[in-house]
């Protein structure tokens, strides 16, 4: 996969040169490139923003730098051009899984008040948001999405490492424990020490249901509950 970032602050993406992202690049699994669209301003002052027509607060990113920078990137008809925008579709694990199947992504990371609408209308295939809040720029959102996407590409990490992640199964992840089995009187559940894999899997599934019920009950509306699941959830409701 190739990922390009249109940004005014390329140095912010240095954080992707560590850990799993670094190894994925070294293995040739993903290629990350930053493009400073100020270099494509097309004017002697390298101006990339201007006052909004009709008045209003803040500055708006001009179309020329973004269009020029996009023209300088090698693209195909399948390239997904993603606008970082608080108005966008919520970025979820399912969206990450979809984008992980693509060959080329371009993230447009804005600053200032917003984008000239012609950028949105004529260049963008997707508008995505990481939450109902506003950041000073799109870089942090793009970095967050990149981490979520790249770890899903085969060979980035061990496949089984992400299969049980929260949201990958439709439920939140079960509690995890490691040694020691007893730390200052705080003990690991006996079932995890039993060696009975059937009982362990049953416990983990119940814990997924319990955590989802307690923290994200909205997810249960779309999860295919078995009769046993429904009975367990009714038990949780009675004990609440």
Swiss-Prot record:
Q: What is its main location?
A: cytoplasm
Superkingdom, according to UniProt?
Bacteria
Q: What EC number(s) has UniProt assigned to this enzyme? A: 2.1.1.228
Q: Which residues bind S-adenosyl-L-methionine?
A: 110, 130-135
Give the EC class as a word.
transferase
Q: Which GO terms describe its molecular function?
A: tRNA (guanine(37)-N1)-methyltransferase activity
Gene3D superfamilies under this entry?
A: 3.40.1280.10, tRNA(m1g37)methyltransferase, domain 2
Task: Keyword check for DNA-binding, yes or no.
Answer: no
Which family, according to the similarity comment? Belongs to the RNA methyltransferase TrmD family.
Matches recorded under HAMAP family: TrmD
Q: How does it assemble?
A: Homodimer.
Which purpose does this protein serve, as stated in its record? Specifically methylates guanosine-37 in various tRNAs.
Q: What is this protein called?
A: tRNA (guanine-N(1)-)-methyltransferase
């Amino acid at each position: 996969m190739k990922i390009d970032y249109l940004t005014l602050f390329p140095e912010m993406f240095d954080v992707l040169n560590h850990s799993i992202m670094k190894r994925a690049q070294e293995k040739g699994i993903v290629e990350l490139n930053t493009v400073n669209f100020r270099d494509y301003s097309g004017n002697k002052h390298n101006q990339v923003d201007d006052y909004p027509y009709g008045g209003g607060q803040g500055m708006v990113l001009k179309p020329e730098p973004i269009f020029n920078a996009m023209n300088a990137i090698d693209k195909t008809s399948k390239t997904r051009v993603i606008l970082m925008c608080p108005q966008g579709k919520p970025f979820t694990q399912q969206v990450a899984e979809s984008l992980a199947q693509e060959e080329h992504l371009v993230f447009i990371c804005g600053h200032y008040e917003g984008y000239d609408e012609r950028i949105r209308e004529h260049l963008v295939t997707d508008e995505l948001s990481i939450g109902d809040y506003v950041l000073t720029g799109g870089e942090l959102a793009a970095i967050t999405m990149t981490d979520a996407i790249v770890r899903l590409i085969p060979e980035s990490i061990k496949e089984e490492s992400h299969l049980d992640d929260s949201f990958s199964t439709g439920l939140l992840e079960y509690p995890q424990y490691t040694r020691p089995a007893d730390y200052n009187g705080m003990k690991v559940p006996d079932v995890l020490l039993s060696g009975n894999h059937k009982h362990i899997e049953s416990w983990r599934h119940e814990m997924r249901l319990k955590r989802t019920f307690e923290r994200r009950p909205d997810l249960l509306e779309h999860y295919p509950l078995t009769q046993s699941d429904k009975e367990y959830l009714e038990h949780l409701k009675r004990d609440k």
